[in-house]
Amino acid sequence: MSPEKYLNFFKETADKKFQWLKEELSKIRTGRPNPKLFDNLLVESYGDRMPMVALAQIAVNPPREIVIKPFDVKNNINAIYSEIQRANLGVQPVIDGDKIRINFPPMTQESRLESIKQAKKVVEQIHQELRSVRRDTLQMIKKDDHKDEDFEEFLKEEVEKVNKQYIAQLETIQKQKEKELLVV
């Protein structure tokens, strides 16, 4: 059995976790407006629930404003407006002719600290899931009952090396997010 089987299992699973982490961290509000905040909003339109990004162009208007311009203003502007209000994002949308403007107030120190706490919680969840993936990989190695104990130890060491790389990457991502949140 080649070491790649185990390392690929570990890496593929960990990469999926990191993709989820990046998506979750992008949803945490920072001092700057982020269009990704609206990626998961589903708007009632044309008799179905559709992603907002399929119904409107979302653009940042520096320094603290997002402008949402529906492709079909007549049919969708009110539905988009209502969904933003319902989503409880801590912002107040304003309909301005054929577009919706959303001003992001500056974050207070309290809201920054709350966002940092939220980011740490998400990172810790991934940290726990990485431990679980590592454990599952090590159990796969053990279950496959290698005749050569040295080879089994080699595999375990390789998994640990890769795990340490992911942990370091996780810490870097957390520090970057905290730095981003602390910028005034």
Swiss-Prot record:
UniProt keyword Cytoplasm, yes or no: yes
InterPro entries in UniProt? Ribosome_recyc_fac, Ribosome_recyc_fac_dom, RRF_sf
In its UniProt record, which GO terms are filed under biological process?
A: translational termination
Is the keyword Transmembrane in the record?
no
GO terms, molecular function: ribosomal large subunit binding
UniProt KW keywords: Cytoplasm, Protein biosynthesis
Q: Which Gene3D superfamilies match?
A: 3.30.1360.40, Ribosome-recycling factor (1.10.132.20)
Where does the UniProt annotation locate this protein? Cytoplasm
**What SUPFAM superfamilies does UniProt report for this protein, alphabetically?**
Ribosome recycling factor, RRF (SSF55194)
GO CC annotations on file: cytoplasm
CDD domains noted in UniProt:
RRF
Q: Which Pfam families match?
A: RRF
Functional note? Responsible for the release of ribosomes from messenger RNA at the termination of protein biosynthesis. May increase the efficiency of translation by recycling ribosomes from one round of translation to another.
Q: Family, per the entry?
A: Belongs to the RRF family.
Q: What is the name of the protein in this document?
A: Ribosome-recycling factor
Task: State the organism of origin.
Answer: Mycoplasma pneumoniae (strain ATCC 29342 / M129 / Subtype 1)
